[in-house]
Structures are given as C-alpha cells and as structure tokens.
Curated annotation (Swiss-Prot):
SUPFAM superfamilies per the UniProt record, alphabetical: GspK insert domain-like, Pili subunits
GO (cellular component) term, any one: plasma membrane
Keyword Transmembrane helix appears in the UniProt entry: yes
Origin organism lineage: Bacteria, Pseudomonadati, Pseudomonadota, Gammaproteobacteria, Enterobacterales
Name assigned to this protein: Putative type II secretion system protein K
Primary localization: membrane
PANTHER family reported in the protein's UniProt record: TYPE II SECRETION SYSTEM PROTEIN K, TYPE II SECRETION SYSTEM PROTEIN K-RELATED
Example GO BP: protein secretion
Length: 327
C-alpha cells in the first residue's frame, strides 16, 4: 500500500470515528432528553396524586361537618381551617377550603326581566345597589346590569341599555355575547360598560356559580363584605348599621335566616319592608365551595383550584370544575 492509499484509508477511518462520535453524542443527548421527559412526567403524576389526595381529605372533612350540622356553614367548622400534610416522598401538600357564597353570583342576572316598563327584579336591584357601594357612578348602573344580563341570556334581543351581538361585532376585535352562564369573573371585561376600573372595584364582591340563583350565606359575611351586605337591603341601612348587624351574629353563627331577620327588624326600620325578598336569597349554610391546593417539592410547586358543589339532600360533594394555578 503506497502513501496515497494509506492517506485515503486514514481519512476514511477518521470520518468513521467522527460519524461514530456524532452518533454517540446524539444518542447521549436523546437519552438525557428522554430522561428529563420521564422525570417531568413522574413529577407531574406525583403532584397530581398529591392534589387528588388533598381533594379527598378536604371533601371528607366537609361531608363530616355537614353530617354533624346540616343547618349551618360557618368559619368555626373544621373544613374551613387550612391544612398541611408532609408526604413520605418529601413533598408537602397544602389545602384550604373556602365558602363560595359570600358574594354576588353574576349568573343570577340571567333571569331578570327584559320588560322596560316592569319593576326591576330583586337581584337586579341588589346588584345596582352594590355597584353604587363599590363607587360606580349611579348613571352607569342600568347599562352595566342590563349588559351583563344580555351577555348571558339565551336570546339575541338587547335590553334598552344592554347589548347583544350587534354591538360586540362592531368592536375591535369583533366578538359574540356568550348566551350562556359565565364561567369566570374575568369575562366581565368583555362586557359593555365594564372598564378596568369598574372591574377592579367589583371583583371583591362578585363571583360566578353554575346556577342562576342568588344565594348568600349570612354566616360567612364579614366587615369586608359590608358593601354587599348593605346592597341586600337596597342600601336602606348604613355602613354602621351593617357593622352592628354583623357584630350581633352569635359566635357559632345564625341558626336560621328568620332569627337574623327578627333581630335586624328590631334595630333597623329600613329592613322590615324587604324581609320577604331578602329571606329568599339569604341562608345560614352554603352549597358551593372553592378548594385551593398546592403540592410543593424541592424542584417546583403546582396548584389547583377545585370548585365544589355540595348536595345537602344526598350529603355528598362533587367537583364540577378545576383550574390550574401557577406559582
């Protein structure tokens, strides 16, 4: 073999070595990528298991508390206390159940009358009063109430101050009214008359539940909820009046709505004309709850928010929606 042939052979060997090195590097990268994906899947499955465990424990405590006392839902009960559990794998899971009925359910506006000559339905009157208490100009209340009602009702006929598809299609970007119940309070931002300032003023007092009922738990209202509390009485009571009524609540909570309204009438004359209407929307117990769960590991945290309906007749709880929380 001459020098030229030896050179060619050496070049071929070097090319083969380079190819083998490239293949080895590619296989190593592929292996590391696959290993990383496997780890991520395992971490995700573990966090999902942690969260499901917390859900089961939270629902069990809620169910037991209702069995022990099915007439009241209060913050003194065990279900309302924050919980934490250290798992064998080193992860920590935390959870907190919260009542979801110390707020105005926006979906209650779906049923209000569209007759411009009729007196406003009580939920519409309550919401108008709440808007005023939240610092929103009285001149904007009709537009906001009717626009929300139009956005979630099933027809395409706008109310006098409301808006349907004909309005939303002219916006940028064009869009449609939902024609169904709201799923998130953030949907308010899409509705005619709701500015960011109005949204931020409203958000502490409103919620969305999968029902068109307006049902508020009188045992869950605090001084932070005074604007809503006053609105329930169409602002016939002052902030100071509302504070007095909240302070009269027994430590273990009101046992019945009648007991609360009896004392309210004794102290404040503005309550009496509204007793029959308020009684239909004020209760000493809750059926809707929100569970916030967080799974914490050395690498990262993941949280879920589970939305719960408790069937009091069957004394069973079910999760009807979950949303991911980022940390």
């Amino acid at each position: 073999m001459n020098n030229e042939q030896r050179g060619v052979a050496l070049l071929i060997v070097l090319m083969l070595l380079a190819l083998m090195a490239a293949l080895a590097a590619d296989m190593t990268l592929s292996f590391h990528s696959q290993l990383q994906r496997t780890r991520q899947v395992n971490h995700h499955l573990q966090r999902q298991y942690d969260i499901e465990l917390a859900e089961k424990l939270a629902l069990a405590s809620l169910t037991q508390d209702v069995k022990d006392n099915d007439r009241q839902t209060t913050l003194q009960q065990y279900w309302a206390q924050p919980q934490q559990l250290q798992l064998e794998d080193g992860n920590t899971v935390k959870w907190q159940l919260r009542d979801a009925q110390h707020c105005f359910n926006l979906n209650a506006l779906a049923k209000i009358s569209d007759d411009p000559l009729a007196s406003p339905d009580f939920p519409a009157q309550v919401f108008s009063a709440l808007l005023i208490n939240a610092g929103i100009d009285r001149g904007n209340t009709d537009e906001i109430v009717q626009s929300i009602a139009d956005y979630i009702d099933v027809d395409d006929s706008p109310r006098f101050h409301g808006a349907e598809d004909s309005f939303y299609q002219s916006q940028t970007p064009p869009r449609h009214s939902a024609n169904q119940m709201l799923f998130l309070t953030g949907e308010l931002r899409q509705i005619k008359g709701i500015t960011e300032n109005i949204y931020q003023r409203l958000i502490p007092y409103v919620c969305v539940l999968p029902t068109t009922e307006l049902s508020i738990n009188l045992n869950m209202l605090t001084e932070n909820d005074i604007p809503l509390f006053r609105a329930l009485f169409l602002n016939n009571i002052t902030d100071a009046d509302a504070r007095v009524l909240l302070q009269k609540r027994p430590r273990e909570g009101w046992l019945t709505t009648d007991a609360f309204l009896y004392w309210a009438q004794q102290d404040f004359s503005g309550v009496k004309p509204l007793v029959a209407q308020v009684k239909r929307h004020l209760f000493p117990y809750s059926r809707y709850f929100t569970l916030s769960t967080e799974s914490i590991s050395d690498e990262q945290s993941q949280g879920w928010q589970s939305h719960i309906f408790f069937n009091r007749k069957q004394q069973s709880a079910q999760i009807y929606r979950r949303t991911l929380q980022l940390y």
